Amino acid sequence: MAFPTSVPLLILLLTFGLLGRPGSATDFVIYSDPPTALLPGQMFHYDLTPQDIPYGRASLVMKPDCNLVLYFNGSKTWATNTTGLGDNCYLTIDSHGEAIVQRNIHYPVWRSNKTSVVGSYAFLLQWNGELGIYGPAIWSSSNEGELSDPKPSNITTDYVFYSYSVLPIGKILEYKNYRLVLRDDCNLVLLDTNTNTQDIKWQTNTYSPLHDCFITLDPNGELFVKHNRRDILWRSNETTNSNFSALVLRYDAKLVIYGPQLWTTKPLW
C-alpha cells in the first residue's frame, strides 16, 4: 500500500501545476506531461506474480528521509543515496527526460544526469525490476485525454508494452477502467469498462476473417497490428532512431509510445 503523503507538499505541487495526480501503490510510471510525481513516503509497486505471470516483485520507495530506494524480490538493488539531504523529497521527470529528486518544491538533491530534446517522457519501474526513462513521445492515440477512476487499485495490471513483444488476440493492456483489447475480428480497441456499453475511446478500425491477429512493437517505436503471420493490417506510422521503445496506456486514457530508452539503472543487454 502507499504510505501517507505530505498534505502541505501535495497542495503546493497542485497549486504550482507540478502534479497531475498523485500515484497509487499499483502505479509504476511517472510522466513529464501530464506531470506526475512520487511523493514523500509513497511506493510504486510492480508485481504480476499473483496472476501467474513471472514479472516482479519490484518496488520503488520515496522514503521520508529523502532516499529513493529500489527493491526487487525483497532485496535493495539501487538507491540515490540521498538520505538526510532534505525534507519532503519527491521524484519527478522533466521535459528533457531527466529524473530529479527534489526537496521543498524545487531544490534538487539527485539527478539522473541524462537529457534529450524537449518533449514528453516516461519514467518506468520495469518488469525486470530495473528503472528506465523513455522518450520523447513518438506517437499517441487520437482520443481526448481524461481522468481514470479515482478509486485506488489493489492489484497490479500491466499497462506497458515493450519492443520485441508479441501478443495475440485478447487483452493487451489495462489501467484501472481502461482496457486495450485486440478483438477476434482484429480490431484493436481502447475501452472504458466503467460504462455499461464499454465505450470505445479509440480503435484501429481493422478487420480480418482469419482470427490470427497479433500486435507487435518494433524497436524503432512503430506499433503494428498484423495477421496471416506477417501481413500488416494497421501501423502507427511514426518511428524514431531507437533500439528499444515502450507503449504505455496512461492514466488519462491516452496510448503513447515513448522511445528510445534514455536512461536505466541496468541495461537490458
Regions found by a protein language model. Name each.
Residues A2-W269:
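Beta-rich ligand-binding surfaces for carbohydrates and other polyanions
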